[in-house]
């Protein structure tokens, strides 16, 4: 768990339980609380931010999915069973994979499990989970040759060619060699 330094409604929170060697049992996991709840978490001193860093054995994760999201587990297993190996890359089968209901591991497993622990850390951490956080992490700067006209919330990252963006909002343009996103 990351040391919580402010009440943030965009992060998950971990409540420390009983001490374990090197960490704590996870007493509770709450994903993205409202502001009043986040303020209470910060005040009680027992909560850390979820840094999104998880370590599972394959079977443990599948057991948790089978327990808390059985349909998701079934589709994951089907996608793997029907998937294909291409050199060092494994591609799950598209049809069962596409049927999996969108849900994060935070909601699907971590809020429900009784078999989790946490290790508290204090480090330079930032959740680059939205455009504002990315902009803040980059000091708001676009990089590479660019020109923005009549734009809001636009970021450019180019390693070569000049990028011009006109009259657009809420986009990021990335140029990496011959690839453009």
Predicted feature locations:
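Conserved core of the sugar-phosphate nucleotidyltransferase
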Residues: 1-99, 117
């Amino acid at each position: 768990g990351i040391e919580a330094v402010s009440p943030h409604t965009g992060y998950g929170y971990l409540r420390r339980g009983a001490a374990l060697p090197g960490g704590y049992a996870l007493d509770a996991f709450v994903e993205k609380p409202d502001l009043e709840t986040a303020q209470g978490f910060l005040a009680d001193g027992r909560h850390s931010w979820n840094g999104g860093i998880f370590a599972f054995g394959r079977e443990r994760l599948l057991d948790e999915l089978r327990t808390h999201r059985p349909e998701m587990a079934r589709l994951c297993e089907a996608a793997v069973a029907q998937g294909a190996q291409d050199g060092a890359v494994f591609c799950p089968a598209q049809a069962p994979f596409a049927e999996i209901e969108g849900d994060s591991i935070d909601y699907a497993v971590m809020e429900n499990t009784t078999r989790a622990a946490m290790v508290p850390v204090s480090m330079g951490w930032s959740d680059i989970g939205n455009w504002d956080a990315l902009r803040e992490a980059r000091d708001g700067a676009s990089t590479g040759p660019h020109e923005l006209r009549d734009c809001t919330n636009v970021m450019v990252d180019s390693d070569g060619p000049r990028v011009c963006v006109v009259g657009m909002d809420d986009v990021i343009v990335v140029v990496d060699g011959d690839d453009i996103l």
